[in-house]
């Protein structure tokens, strides 16, 4: 609740620490009407920074709450010094680099962008296959899906290694003969063609 956030921010500041709030959703038109209320809440709470990924949201918050420190979320997929410089020119105080950026690239970006705070994830999910930015192809085949060279790893056949209760590992190959023994559905073979169907309800 708003009261919980107020209490949390007050506690953090009383202990000389900083607190950041996220507004890093990618907005659909149906969400835009809610943005003024979100921004008013942020202005009321006065966090030490706000993490944003959507350029439109960044522009709106910058215009309507210029006193807030704006940070760019990892979901903005910042992978180069050019992208960092762009966001810096827009008024960003900190950029969280994309999860696929190597340590060597981070060092180079730091040298080329010395006057802005940079942050990176050290551990956690890799958020693969969202909006076409598939990292599986990069990782398994050294082919960038974002540059028209996708290896379509999502369509490969895989083997599962299951760890049993006794600690032993059993290899299982999923094929037409044993697929009905599993509780999950191998959807891909039941869909003709190369493209996924678009299925959408009132929730998106």
Residue ranges and their predicted role:
Residues 1-78, 82, 96-100, 104-204:
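Active-site pocket-lining/capping segments in soluble small-molecule metabolic enzymes
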């Amino acid at each position: 609740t708003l009261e919980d956030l107020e209490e949390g921010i007050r506690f953090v500041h009383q202990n000389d620490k900083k607190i950041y709030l996220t507004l890093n959703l990618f907005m659909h038109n149906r969400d835009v009407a809610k943005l003024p209320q979100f921004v008013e809440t942020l202005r009321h709470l006065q966090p030490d920074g706000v993490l944003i990924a959507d350029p439109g949201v960044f522009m709106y918050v910058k215009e309507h709450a210029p006193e807030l420190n704006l940070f760019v979320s990892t979901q903005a997929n910042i992978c180069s010094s050019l992208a960092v410089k762009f966001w810096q020119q827009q008024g960003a105080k900190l950029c969280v680099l994309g999860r696929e950026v190597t340590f060597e690239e981070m060092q180079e970006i730091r040298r080329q962008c010395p006057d802005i705070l940079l942050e990176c994830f050290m551990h956690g999910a890799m958020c693969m296959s969202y909006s076409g930015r598939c990292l599986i192809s990069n990782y398994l085949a050294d082919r960038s899906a974002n540059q028209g060279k996708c290896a379509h790893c999502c369509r490969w056949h895989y083997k599962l290694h299951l760890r049993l209760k006794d600690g032993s590992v059993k290899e299982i190959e999923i094929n037409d003969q044993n697929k009905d023994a599993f509780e999950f559905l191998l959807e891909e073979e039941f869909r003709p063609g190369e493209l996924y169907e678009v299925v959408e309800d009132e929730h998106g």
